Every structure is written in structure tokens, then in C-alpha cells.
Amino acid sequence: MQEQYNPQEIEQKVQQHWDDSETFVVSEDPNKEKFYCLSMFPYPSGRLHMGHVRNYTIGDVVSRFQRLQGKNVMQPIGWDAFGLPAENAAVKNNTAPAPWTYENIEYMKNQLKLLGFGYDWKREFATCTPEYYRWEQEFFTKLYEQGLVYKKTSSVNWCPNDQTVLANEQVEDGCCWRCDTPVEQKKIPQWFIKITEYAQELLDDLDNLEGWPEMVKTMQRNWIGRSEGVELSFAVNGEEAPLEVYTTRPDTLMGVSYVGIAAGHPLAEKASKNNPELAAFVEECRNTKVAEAELATMEKKGMDTGLTAIHPLNGRVVPVYVANFVLMDYGTGAVMAVPAHDQRDYEFATKYGIDIIPVIKPEDGSELDVSEAAYTEKGVLFDSGEFDGLAFQEAFDAIAAKLEAEGKGKKTVNFRLRDWGVSRQRYWGAPIPMVTTEDGEVHPVPADQLPVILPEDVVMDGVTSPIKADKSWAETTFNGEPALRETDTFDTFMESSWYYARYCSPQADDILDPEKANYWLPVDQYVGGIEHACMHLLYSRFFHKLLRDAGYVTSDEPFKQLLCQGMVLADAFYHENEKGTKEWIAPTDVTVERDGKGRIEKAVDDQGREVEHSGMIKMSKSKNNGIDPQEMVDKYGADTVRLFMMFASPADMTLEWQESGVEGANRFLKRVWKLVHAHSSKGAAETVDASALSGNQKALRRDIHKTIAKVTDDIGRRQTFNTAIAAIMELMNKLAKAPQESVQDRAILDEALKAVVRMLYPMTPHISYEMWIALGESNVDSATWPTFDEKALVEDEKTIVVMINGKLRAKLTVAADATEEQVRELGLNDENAKKFLDGLTIRKVIFVPGKLLNIVAN
């Protein structure tokens, strides 16, 4: 073992050993407990960023910890390789998405290896290869045959200038990002998978996910959005078909003063035919894409259609308005509006002078006031005829029963969740395996003709998808008849919804090998960002249930435990140019002066300009405050970067990047190295003889075993990796000061260092590998996690604090099993205590075993 710690040399050597010996390549072993650890796979954007490093370090720490617990650990990696950024980069760099993607994969793969992550590289795949998406295509055709896939028209963002569909992120302030043309909403046929068929199960099974953060489960519950309500009909004057509305508040029915319909509702289209003003308003609403989250805050606009509806119970005639806050995608595209008891309806009614009819008053008898805002609480009905005096649930049931009896409504369960639209009008995605014959019939591509391969040698013009532009690509046959291929591609969430399962049998000649899949699944630990709570994590749960119902897997859920790591933040600096726009300056190009509390007082860039400090914010390209992991690894070594990542903050909280913290982690590793070197260079040590230890030696050994117990619990159960590292650091401080003279001193240090090296191994595997060999052991990758000795934790002696009238006056060292009488006698005879009791009468003595003797005297 060299005296100086040289991370670059060590890491290169150890990584080569892992590659050569295929340390992390695994197969099914029925005799061993399995552990499947997975971090969300990366999009091959070109370079790893610190967010990746944090995510993958956490996954690797869990994997290596479980490995030393003796489990059969699988930790795979791959590439989420389809998607829009590749198309944009291809246009910008005058290339095709495929070569750009494959080059990035090679570069990033090398970066992952330099960080020392223990992946089974034999399981690696990229989702953009036909070997992967072929099975997705086949599974989709099976779902179609089961009636779980259908096609319907749905709105998309349309650029009339480029004549192309835009993704949401390509719409900037309502305009096309390329040509600045106002974007329109256009209806086109698209493919959907019936996730709504599984809505109730997806909701119910959240209760079984005990290893998931409560916040993620709440987000999914809200996204699925189960509600119990009433679906009821309003007859429309002059129309045959009634207006169907859904409400969760039938108790407010008698307060309805208008009906609101979405701009896309058939009635709105009909009413606007002979009303140019209404037609223009409908068009404006349709081309204003509204996110559901914005509904509460946006300006409420509407227009009277001239149509009237008839209240189903009291016969009141109410106007029908087109309203911009009613969305066609949710419910029936029509709402019954009760301004007195719904704030959105209230704002709209106030603006357009529509009646506000209160019908609910507070249960506590306080005065009802709707002069400034709606009263939205549940309460007691009044001015509601036969329903007066009823509370919410009674009114709900009674009104629903009456509507049902009259054939005008029924109780129903509604979900906010919509079917999954999987069509994308983009090129760089898996082709949807459907064809249309000349008679207009749609058919799935037969299994023996799969995969439908996406051509990779294409020219991107930045506007039209190459497979849409090349008419010959779509031309094919079906049962000998001419047919046209679907030129839309799958939503890239399709690939990431089942990749975790493909890792179990990446070479299988089917979507999965059930035997292998059921050995490994479900994933024991999944690590990724909380931003995926509602899309990726929900789609994966759905896909898992589809795979189960198709007979491939036996489990109900894909991921047992979920850890959502926090974001990585860094200081951000900017300079305002003459135009008043912010130029973001990289933190590495800024010199800062700090005050006594470490706050930045002044910042100057490398051109000598004073720059503004914007605070600690998420690392991003747009703010130019990303720190390149490569530079940090080159400077300090992978182990240091990994250790800092795990120590600087709890895994699920934001992490503030501070290079001073990285330097601190590096100094700590040097200290450990130095102590191991000093100890090992003296030759082999004896084993600990517990019966021959002095009091101080026993105390140190107790600290060692307490640390093992704490670190084991912190990493294994609590996943508070930062406190585990803090405990190891604390122990190292004690070991550095401990005597190393006697045989038993060296024996204890040897036991301690062997424990420390194994406890550090998950975080810092390269240095641990070297130190383990220096300590006379063979291979730390196949070592056993240290176990704490229960006997070592037992204390022979206790320190008892003596308090006199609430103030600390003495400390006693007593036998661990000392009785109250013995402690009392020692306490009252302690020289210091006697001083403070002189001349006082003892009134009360309180004894807390093993801790405290409290004396009250006056």
C-alpha cells in the first residue's frame, strides 16, 4: 500500500479489475435472496450532470450495501434513447438523431464507468433499437386485440405555417418556437390505451406501497382523482339530446343559475354556426391551451349561446354559456354552475350579471354571506323545497334518488384520469404497428412482420417527420392488399414503462422470460426524481398490471421501495447587459468574497465585472450553473465525489453544491488512508480478547460496535446515508486519537478499520478495495457486512449526573448495575456535592436509573 492516496491510479486499477472479473454480472440463483436495485435510466443527452451522479450514486450505495449482506444483487443500466431533444440536436448539428444518440451513449457509458457504479453491463440496452421496441410493438397489438387500445380524434398543438404538430415544450407563449406563428389547436386521430379500465386498481394498490414516499402516493391519488357524484341531464330547449353534466355537489342543485359548456362541445359548435361573434369566441378558446392547474387563476371568459336549459327538478330556465374554464377533456365537457357555492362560477356570474342563488347555509347557524365570495363549505340546505334542512350526505342521497326515479340522473363514480394518448407526430420514436387498408379498415401488423423498423439514415428538416415526408415508407401490404402504415410514433413514456422488466431477461425471444422476470421482480429499490410521480411511475404501474394480466409476471406492482432524490443546487451569477437581459456566468468563472457567516458579499467574474448572485438554485444549462462531474472526478477522484454526494444532505432533500465540502470529503478519505497505511505497515494484528480489555479499551470497542449498529440501520432501514457517514467520521476521530501501543490496542484498531472499510465500501468502493487488501483481506466485493457484537455494547460502568436544585454539581462513575442506595450514598458523599449541600436540609432525592440523581434541598 502506497503512503500517499492517489485516487486516479487506484480507481483505474479497481475498475479494470471489475471489468475483467465481471464482478457485477449476475444470474438467477434460487438459493440466494435476490435484491433488484434500479435507478431511473438516463436520456443520452451527451454528458452526465450532477443530478445523474446523485441518482446513480444512491442506487450504487444501496446495491453494494445489499451485496455485502450476502444477497444476489442485480443493478442494471440502459438508455432511454428516443425523444425530441435528439431531433432538435440533429437539426442543429446537421446530422440524424441515431448517430447523435449512439455517440452520446458511448461517451456517457464511459463517464458512468469512471464513477465506479457496479452495473451488470451485459444487461444494457438502448430503447431506440428494434431489438427492444419490437416487443413493445407486439404487446401493443395484443392489447388492441383485447380491446384495450382504440383510436379517436384529439387536440394537438398545430403550427399553421410549418404545417406540423408541436410538442407542448415547443410552444412558447402560445407561438411556435421556430417561426413564432400563433399556435392553433387541431383535432387529429390518435391512439389511446385504456388506463381508465385500471383506475380503481391503480388507486387501491397505492395502499400496499408501504415503501413509497407518502407525497408520491398522494400525487398519484390526486392524479387518478376518484370522485363520487351524480350524472344528471338538463333538457335543452329546441334540442333533442339533453346536456349531461357531472357534479360532486348535488346538494347545491337548487342553486344552479346557468350551465357552462366547453368550446369543443357539440352544442357550442352548433350554436356558433349562425352566430359569427360566438364562432370567433369558440375559436379563440380552442386555440388557447389551458392546463388544468391554471383554471383557478386564469381570467374567466364566456359568451351566451342563446340556448336555454331546463332545471331537472324545479323546471327553472337557465342560460347556456360557452366558458373558457370548462374543458372538453374532463367529465362531460359541461358543468352545472352554482355561483353562490363555487368560486369559479361566482367570478363568472359576477362578470356577466348572472343570478347568484344561495341554497346552503353554515351548519353552525352563523350568517351566510355571499356578497364578496362564494360559500364553498358543506352545510345545511335551504330554499331547496323538500330538501330543506338536510345536511350534505342526506341531501346527496335524496337528490340522487329523486333524479334516478325520474330518469334524469344517477349516482356515479368519476375519475380525473384520462386514457393514455400514446400517439406522437414525431420521427424519433418507435413506429406504431398499425396499418390501414384501402377500404379504411385498421389492422395491427402481424407478429411475423414485426418489428416495424424506424429508418435511421434520414435527413431532418426540423419541420416534417422523415417517415411522414417519405410517402414510400408508409406503403405496405396487408393480406396481399395495399395498405398504409401508421406514421405516428409512440410516446416515449411507452419505452420507460416496461424497461425495468426487460432487464430481467434482455435477450429473451419475447417481451419477457416469465421465469427470470418472476425471480427478479418486483424491483426492491427504485431511485429517481419526484418529477416522475404522476407520469412515468403511474404508467409503469399500469404496464406491470397489463404484463400480469397477460401472464408474464405474478406480482401486482413493479417497485417495492421508492426513493426520490432531491435536486442538486449551485450558486448562480448573472450580469445584466446593455439590453437589460441577464447573461448567466458559470460559477467556475466567478471569484467571491464572503462575510463572517459565509454569505456572499461580492462576486467578480473573470473579466473583472461585478456580478449579481442569484442564490443557490437548481443546476441547469439555462442558468449556466452546472458543475461538470468529469472535472470533479479528474480533480478529486470518483470516491470523493460519491462521498460528498451522500454526505452533504439527506438523500431526499436538495443538495447544495459546495466545492469546500468536496475538499472536506477528500481530506477525510486521506485521513482514513493514512491511518490504514500506518496500521498495516506494522504488520498483522492479533484478534481482540474481550476478557483482557481495560476500561478505556472496552469504551472504544463499544463505540466501534455502536457505530456498526447505527450505520447498518441508517443505510439499510432509514436510508439516512448522511448520518451513517457522520457516524463513521466521528468514529475515525476517536480511532485517530486512540493509543496503538499494546497488543490489544492494535487488535481493537484492526477490528475497527476492517469495519470502517466495509462501511465505507458502498460510498467509496475503490479506496475500500485497496485498503481491504492492505488490511490482509482478499476481495471486499465479496466480503460480509460487519455485524455488531451485542456483548461489546453492554456497559460495565455508567456515568450518573448529580443535580442539586436544578444545577449540575457532580458526575459519578458507577457500576452499570449499581442500586439506588449505592448511587445515593456515593452522590451524597461526593466532595463537590457536599460543598453545595453544606448547611441545607435535603427535602427530596429523585433517582433515574443509569442517568441521574436529582437532589432538592433548602
UniProtKB/Swiss-Prot annotation:
Alphabetical GO biological process terms: leucyl-tRNA aminoacylation
Record has Kinase as a keyword: no
Keywords linked to the UniProt accession: Aminoacyl-tRNA synthetase, ATP-binding, Cytoplasm, Ligase, Nucleotide-binding, Protein biosynthesis
Record's subcellular location: Cytoplasm
Binding residues for ATP: K621
Sequence motif: 'KMSKS' region, positions: 618-622
First-level EC class: ligase
Main location: cytoplasm
A Pfam family recorded for this sequence: Anticodon_1
Keyword Aminoacyl-tRNA synthetase: yes
Reactions accelerated catalytically: tRNA(Leu) + L-leucine + ATP = L-leucyl-tRNA(Leu) + AMP + diphosphate
GO CC entries: cytosol
EC number: 6.1.1.4
Extent of motif 'HIGH' region: 42-52
UniProt GO molecular function: aminoacyl-tRNA deacylase activity; ATP binding; leucine-tRNA ligase activity
Similarity annotation: Belongs to the class-I aminoacyl-tRNA synthetase family.
Record NCBIfam families: leuS_bact
Name of the protein in question: Leucine--tRNA ligase
Gene name per UniProt: leuS
